[in-house]
Amino acid sequence: MMNISEKKRLYTTTELLSIGATYYEIEKMVNAGILYKLDKSVYETVKYSGEESDFYYAMAYAPKGVVCLMSAAVHYGLSTCRPSEVDIAIPRNHKVSTLPEWPPLHVVSFTGDRYSVGIVEQIEDDNKYNIYDIEKTIIDILFYRNKVGIEETKEILINYLGRSDRDLNKLHEYAQKLRCEKILRTYLEILI
């Protein structure tokens, strides 16, 4: 039986096949308790010994998904408000076939630039997930301020402005590209 890395939490069927496993060996590993089948093409490594993250599982159920909104804000340390669901953005023409019981996902459909701008691939050990960069997260929070909440939006923007690694030029560029410039200007005038 082949050796599965204990540093990688989830494998797709394609990844297992690319490292030399056959469908028969995959089924054998499931029966032996080495892998646990989450859905038709995603397997969980039972002997995983790294950090746990809901984001790994979210990507398993939404492969084109990008961590966004409050989940991204918490990831960057911009908010103390912990969301009860993982916020995931997907392209408008894609669907999430099966929503898992855990982690609960809040799926948001984005179109065009709102989806494609600012995607960053995060790698932790052998695990990968996509998340929007901090400036794109700020613009999305401002755009969805009525759903996120005005107080949370204010807290996130204040925390961003207090960071030494903030990039106001990039923030302004994203605001222009995503038609959120007027909202950003209003919030900055109030806070500064």
Mark where each language-model region is.
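Nucleic-acid-binding surface
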Residues: 5-18, 25, 30-32, 38, ...
